[in-house]
């Protein structure tokens, strides 16, 4: 990320003066896909790509925002109830509203931002943007009184309330809590977390952009979540203590099979197995067993392709190609 580039665009677009610069990273998730909104475990890590924003209070009640990458400009009043039409501006609008709900006296500001997280590549450019502005508003207007846990929730609430995505907490948590050289095992129910050093000596983690873009709000994301909730509802008939798929065993799922559609059963089966895979990978990492880590990653891709059905031809091809070449991991959805 180039701070000077963002600064030069800010100076050019606004009044020739400078403001404060804030940045947050994107993320990868080594394993634990679609487990976060089921109360399970995930295993993300921050990356060296992210979002940078320059921000300067403007003495009004209006936010003036410029997307450098999209060359688009939006203004909105902080008292407005309706979010801007531009999808990117909804993230900034949502963060402002959510911070105000938490008692931060947000005032108008000028801002320009840019990033080097590939958009739509599953590396959480939106969470990086939300975290950047949550940090900024907390610093500029909130005396940093909002803690990091709550800043992550600000981003999640922004997705829920202003962007139409009923997401879990993983993306925002990884952006806020990410630490160089480590992955984070996050319990998405309790928000307890543990850092695991990641130093795959003898191996290299390769990130490949399939160039297939995804849009969570317009994809099957919300439908998958509904399938998980339907499976939980069926299991609850005999096990009322169950709240999320995190609480369900394969035995309990099999017991309720007659009340679950074939499609919903497959979705739930994948999630239950994936939650266990995260724990298995953490155990393997502590032993330095990267062969097992790679095997579990391959199992994850197979499950996402055949059970959760969120892969695509391009990713399946990349996964098979890597496997044929002797690699130990899998293509990342």
Residue ranges and their predicted role:
Residues 1-127, 131-148, 153, 157, ...:
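ATP-binding N-lobe of GHMP and related small-molecule kinases
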Residues 1-27, 52-85, 182-329:
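C-terminal nucleotide
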Residues 166-168, 308-309:
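Short amphipathic alpha-helical segments at helix boundaries and their inter-helical linkers
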Residues 331-333:
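Conserved small/polar residues in nucleotide/adenosyl-binding loops
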């Amino acid at each position: 990320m180039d701070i000077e580039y963002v600064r030069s665009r800010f100076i050019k677009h606004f009044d020739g003066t400078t403001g404060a610069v804030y940045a947050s990273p994107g993320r990868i998730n080594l394993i634990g896909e679609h487990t976060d909104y089921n109360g399970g475990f995930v295993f993300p890590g921050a990356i060296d790509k992210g979002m940078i924003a320059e921000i300067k209070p403007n003495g009004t009640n209006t936010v003036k925002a410029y997307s450098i990458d999209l060359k688009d400009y939006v203004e909105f009043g902080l008292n407005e109830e309706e979010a801007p039409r531009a999808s990117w501006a909804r993230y900034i609008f949502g963060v402002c509203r959510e911070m105000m709900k938490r008692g931060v006296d947000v005032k108008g500001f000028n801002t320009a931002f840019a990033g080097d997280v590939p958009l739509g590549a599953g590396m959480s450019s939106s969470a990086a943007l939300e975290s950047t502005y949550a940090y900024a508003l907390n610093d500029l207007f909130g005396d940093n009184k909002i803690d990091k846990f709550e800043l992550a929730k600000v981003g999640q609430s922004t997705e829920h309330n202003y962007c139409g995505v009923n997401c879990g907490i993983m993306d925002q948590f990884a952006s806020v809590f990410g630490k160089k050289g480590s992955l984070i095992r996050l319990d998405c129910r309790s928000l307890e977390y543990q850092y695991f050093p990641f130093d795959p000596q003898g191996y290299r983690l390769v990130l490949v952009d399939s160039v297939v873009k995804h849009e969570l709000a317009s994809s099957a994301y919300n439908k998958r979540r509904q399938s998980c909730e339907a499976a939980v509802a069926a299991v609850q008939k005999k096990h009322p203590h169950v709240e999320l798929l995190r609480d369900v065993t394969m035995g309990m799922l099999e017991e309720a099979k007659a009340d679950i559609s074939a499609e919903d059963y497959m979705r739930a089966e994948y999630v239950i197995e994936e939650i266990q895979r995260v724990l298995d990978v953490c155990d393997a990492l502590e032993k330095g067993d990267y062969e097992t880590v790679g095997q579990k990653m391959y199992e994850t891709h197979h499950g996402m392709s055949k059970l959760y059905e969120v892969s695509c031809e391009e990713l399946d091809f990349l996964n098979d190609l890597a496997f044929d070449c002797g690699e130990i991991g899998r293509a990342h959805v």
